[in-house]
Amino acid sequence: MPRLILLIILSLTLSCCGEIDSPPPQSAVPEATNIAIADLRKLVDGRNVYIEESLIVGGYITSNDKASNFYKTFIIEDATSAIEIMAGLYDLHNIYPEGYYVTLKLKDCYIATHFGVLQVGRKAESYSNYPTEYFASRVLLDRHAHPVK
């Protein structure tokens, strides 16, 4: 009898595991992009570029701050290249988990390369050693980055 009760409790415990945090299926990926990340890299060509056009890039999140190896940033990647989003927020892995697809509206953003890494963010201050600045606000970040859940 105790074994039966233990077996029932164990089976109920294991059956409650759901796929709450799993990434969305690939069929949920929107077709809203109009430029590849590799084309952005060619556009930058060693400069800090302000984007005035309605450019939209998309990619899967491949790295975030969960393992503490990226500070306040996350990286999206498409089939051509990758770009670092200078979010400026803590615990980004809760908002942008690995495997999610993100479309990024680049209008009114700055893009540049820093040590070979393509970055998107706000305009850096004149005294800054960095080519782009963090968005540093969830409101600003939400205007540009849209994850598919």
Identify the meaning behind each predicted range.
Residues 1-17:
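Sec-dependent bacterial lipoprotein signal peptides
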